[in-house]
């Protein structure tokens, strides 16, 4: 497009105006926790959310056009424009293209809204009667998961939306999903 009205298109990269679409800084973020208890069981949940910002796929500059033809490309390149009349938002691949046509493209800009199950713990504490006979204090078995579920609200987003202050992904390693098992015994 030539400007923010999106009323005209151009093939001349220099003829397009730069437009501010949003901010990398979330408008809202926070977390909420809850614990549910029933008899000896406890379920602890912590959710974290971030809303109202955009994230940019910096690596997409290299992975979508033909700038670096020998490097790995995104699977979405299979949806690229290939013949007249085809409708797609992935441009034609030009082998050896050197103009960084994707550098400041909105194709690489995504809504960064997400909610993540940051921590979930399911535990069971043995009854006190059993423990007193064994001479033990509180004994709890648990299984804990970290970052097991992330819901994003932009269907095109293929990377972890939780990233640094610039909200730019550059092949960053996503936050690990971790599951631990444990036993806590008080003597």
Question: What spans do the regions from the language model cover?
Answer:
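C-terminal beta-signal and terminal closure region of outer-membrane beta-barrel proteins
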Residues: 73, 78-85, 100-102, 150-187
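Membrane-embedded beta-strand positions of outer-membrane beta-barrel proteins
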Residues: 45, 141-143, 183
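Extracytoplasmic gating/loop element in the C-terminal half of outer-membrane beta-barrel translocons
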Residues: 50-140, 145, 158
